[in-house]
Amino acid sequence: MAIITIARELASLGEETAQELSQISGYKLIDKEYLEGKLNSIGITAEKRQKYDERNPGFWASLSQQRDDYLHFLKTAILDAAQENNCIIMGRGGYVILRGVPHMLSVKITAPLSVRVERTKRTFGCDNKRALQIIEQSDHDRGGFHKYFFSTDWTDGREYDLTINTGNTDPAHAAVAIDSLRKVFVDKVKEEAGVQKIEDLVLAQNVVTEIIYARKIPVHFLEATVERGSVVLHGVANAQSSIDTALAATHSLSGVKHAESAIQLVQEFTVMP
């Protein structure tokens, strides 16, 4: 039992590799269509997603509430999928959202630029110049997406357990390589620890959803950390009543064994002229 995340460059055959991997491993493929369906079901429409989905958001988009909503519910959708285990999560920063999960195997699919250009020319029926423009825009958008949402450099090979260059291999053989590593990478100890970690991450996400989105309690920059059902709330509030209400909301959730606050209380003040 494992979770595989795949980050891929445009024209690196990442999607094709993931499909092959799903077939030989029996793992469920969590792709763009799956995640879009999840986000649609909770009100993150295509119109809202188009500003952020594996894109480099503009200045105003990066400051909007829609950005926070998109990121929160993207995490929710990915964690819900990961909780089922035995899945392959395509893109969307899955390897960052699940960072630290012991039975998660992170993979990057890449290819030489010259190969990517030829593949892009075939796909779009364009010349070299246009193909290069398409690739550069995609790389810029995906790099910006990871930087703005996760403060990470997705081109850094240290972010991944395995990087595969498909310049000289096909998706079928790339998938076999990933599956072979998966079989030796994930043992019983990692599996058990990973399942527990996912449970903690899901509960932390549920806590934030309950406080911010369900009850709309005014706690700013709210984060929840969870370890085996013990929850610590972090953030900023300007009233003790907000902190108390947030703690009560946390205690009401199934799976919470203990909850405490590390929320900073900052009293409002007025600057006099």
Please provide the spans of the model-predicted regions:
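Conserved beta-strand scaffold positions in the cores of enzyme catalytic domains, especially
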Residues: L29, M104-S106, D161-T163
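Short glycine-rich anion-binding loops that position phosphate/pyrophosphate groups of nucleotides
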Residues: Q65, G93-Y95, T169
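RNA pseudouridine synthases
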Residues: A81, C87-V101, L105-A111, V115, ...
